[in-house]
Amino acid sequence: MYKRQGVYDPNIFKAFFLAGGPGSGKSYVVRRTTGGLGMRVVNSDDAFEKLLKDADLSLKMPDSEEQQREPVRQRAKEITKAKQKNYINGRLGLIIDGTGKDYDKIAYQARQLETLGYDTHMIFVNTSLDVALERNAKRARSVPEQIVVNSWKTVQQNIGKFSNFFKGNFIIVDNNNAQEDILTDVFKRIKNLANQKIKNRRADKWIATELQKKGVKFSGGQSQFKKFAGKRR
């Protein structure tokens, strides 16, 4: 039995951007809809919350701790950036968690990944403003209400832009009160996109190089690679 990693890892060259403001329930949705796909989650919030606890700082983000909190936030970003770099070096499948408030930044990141051979997608988790405010208030790490309002409005303005950019690779999830049947449908759609053969032809060169390092000949074409990789799993 061969360990699946690098070129043999499931869903290499697939990147899913996750968008949705504070209180949208992104973390819940991604847990319920991407399990078992072998994707690596890139989320600075995880490192940030751990470092806040280690520094004995409140998850409620009070203004009185802003000065102590900022270096912790920067350290969390550095840790996350290093992890993402390692994942990308192995062309591993990615779930890149963010709010979606900065369209230009996400579009730039997506184009950079595409130059490396990735197929890019977006999962947009949407809620009403009232639901977002209610959920934010119940979170262990909440943010000020005005930040939720401003973020929600900005993210809403970007829905059309993201839809045009990602086109058929854009999935929107209504998470005001997502029932099991909705999450099951979203899981199927994500799994279908993740399992599709890689459309970006730049991936072939990288796959061929990695297989050659292992003494395997690869003439190109995802069907050949998937057939071979399936035997090694």
List the model feature ranges, each with a label.
Residues 28-92, 104:
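Conserved substrate/cofactor phosphate-moiety recognition/catalytic segment
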Residues 114-135:
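Conserved phosphate-donor/acceptor-positioning beta-strand/loop module used by diverse small-molecule
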Residues 6-13, 86-88:
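Phosphate-binding P-loop
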Residues 1-5:
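Conserved small/polar residues in nucleotide/adenosyl-binding loops
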Residues 25:
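Conserved glycine(s) of the Walker
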Residues 130-233:
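Conserved GTP-binding G-domain of TRAFAC-class P-loop NTPases and closely related GTPase folds
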Residues 15-17:
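Short hydrophobic/aromatic beta-strand immediately N-terminal to the Walker A/P-loop
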